[in-house]
Amino acid sequence: MIKVEIDEGSGFCFGVVTAIHKAEEELAKGETLYCLGDIVHNSREVERLKAMGLITINRDEFRQLRNAKVLLRAHGEPPETYQIAHKNNIEIIDATCPVVLRLQKRIKQEFRKEDFEEKQIVIYGKNGHAEVLGLVGQTGGQAIVIESAEEAKKLDFTKSIRLFSQTTKSLDEFQEIVEYIKLHISPDATFEYYDTICRQVANRMPNLREFAATHDLIFFVSGKKSSNGKMLFEECLKVNANSHLIDNEKEIDPTLLRNVKSIGVCGATSTPKWLMEKIHDHIQLLIKD
């Protein structure tokens, strides 16, 4: 008998849960609701909310909008978004994650200090990611984004550095960057770093590694756009080479189910629990066949 188990620690983080709840609440009123960008980096959940009436728009479409209601997702937005909304009489339903909001405020405070010209505000994150765009926006576009310790080489080590992190990045990689900067910063410059990684995300990594290591086969469920999904899937691979990234049940290769005694189903902070349950049930059907 093959055991199939869902990782109880996987699924939406509280920021995403709040954003989806706010969307459902507004849609239940029967009014038109727009969302600036995909509410979550999971196509199946986006499709579910679209069926309920949620209209996803891009930034160009947002700029053309007038007298409407727009949901801002958990990732957060730059100040410009709120300015456009005010100008165009757009009602904002703000679902920015409180962890992201606190980070935005800290970066803005650092940017407004008198000695800004003498230092660099550096953000460890994915270039172009929605959260990172919102963070860089707090500095009027002047923050430097780096994706790795390798990219830290482009920094000016004769100038002081203030380092922040996208909330969903790897704690280990953040520490690597910290050590690299400490090693190369000029004695005349100062270096301060702020561990701004969400603990709900960071704490998942050891638990996920443990879960992946206890099963013969892992199906990691995540949208292909999810930055957090890619990072967590890599953690699964480190402890279990028989880990496979899938977006939905149709991507399961039935031949993988041969000669295994236990299968684990887990996912990213952008993966809905209902989708993992659907995949669990689909695996059970394949096993019976």
Swiss-Prot record:
GO terms for cellular component: cytosol. Isopentenyl diphosphate binds at residues 41, 75, 129, 226-228, 270. It holds the Pfam family LYTB. Its EC number is 1.17.7.4. Binds 1 [4Fe-4S] cluster per subunit. Its cofactor is [4Fe-4S] cluster. Keywords: 4Fe-4S, Iron, Iron-sulfur, Isoprene biosynthesis, Metal-binding, Oxidoreductase. It is an enzyme of class 1 (oxidoreductase). CDD domains: lytB_ispH. Dimethylallyl diphosphate binds at residues 41, 75, 129, 226-228, 270. (2E)-4-hydroxy-3-methylbut-2-enyl diphosphate binds at residues 41, 75, 129, 167, 226-228, 270. Gene3D superfamilies: 3.40.50.11270, 4-hydroxy-3-methylbut-2-enyl diphosphate reductase, catalytic domain. PANTHER family: 4-HYDROXY-3-METHYLBUT-2-ENYL DIPHOSPHATE REDUCTASE. This is 4-hydroxy-3-methylbut-2-enyl diphosphate reductase. It comes from Bacteroides thetaiotaomicron (strain ATCC 29148 / DSM 2079 / JCM 5827 / CCUG 10774 / NCTC 10582 / VPI-5482 / E50). The lineage of its organism: Bacteria, Pseudomonadati, Bacteroidota, Bacteroidia, Bacteroidales.
